[in-house]
A protein has these predicted regions:
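Structured alpha-helical
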Residues: 1-189
């Protein structure tokens, strides 16, 4: 039975944890206006990322039907196309090193892989590259609340706007639900 011991939490809220490229861009006094300016783009990025996440079939399809085979081939071609586009983006736009990151609508924590560490209290924008096929990063303005000597950086976001916050919370919840379902699956030996 799932006991919640592996639940990923940040600022006392369910969080999303994975390995992604992340960087910090210092900016003087980010305001709610900056978060609003990033909002539409962040919503589109989160919606695209959600569409790319593998959710699996909602209903068991008839694998013998010709339509199922066509859909599977189409899905494989789209995945191949996304991989190729991602490789082109990666070749033309270098990204930061992928690091373990945990984030939700309230903040983010990651280990800095290179470069100088920001100071606690520094203001700026956390940039999280969600997928190789997405050209732009998620841009989340906030303030550094803690920096550890080994390079862990914790940022509290400015209010991101309802649409962005809802999408981040939804994605964190889905990931958490899949982890619970995976923990409940009997292991095959």
């Amino acid at each position: 039975m799932f006991d919640g011991a592996d639940t990923v939490v940040l600022y006392e809220e369910l969080a999303f944890q994975t390995v992604l490229p992340v960087q910090w861009r210092p900016t003087p006094n980010p305001t709610s206006d900056i978060a609003a300016a990033f909002s539409d783009r962040n919503v589109r990025l989160l919606q695209a990322w959600d569409a790319m996440e593998e959710h699996g079939p909602t209903e068991k399809t008839d694998e013998n039907s010709p339509a199922a085979a066509d859909l599977m081939r189409l899905e494989l071609k789209i995945n191949l196309l996304l991989d190729l586009v991602g490789q082109l983006f990666a070749a033309n736009r270098p990204r930061p090193t992928a690091v373990p990151v945990r984030f939700n609508a309230l903040g983010v924590v990651w280990r800095n892989a290179s470069g100088p560490l920001p100071e606690a209290g520094a203001q700026g924008v956390a940039e999280i590259y969600l997928h190789d096929a997405l050209a732009e990063p998620l841009r989340l303005p906030g303030r550094v609340t803690n920096v550890t000597p080994d390079g862990n950086i914790k940022v509290r976001f400015l209010p991101l706007g309802e649409a962005v916050a809802d999408l981040i919370e939804k994605l964190a919840f889905r990931r958490h639900r899949r982890q619970i379902a995976g923990a409940r699956q009997p292991r095959r030996t």
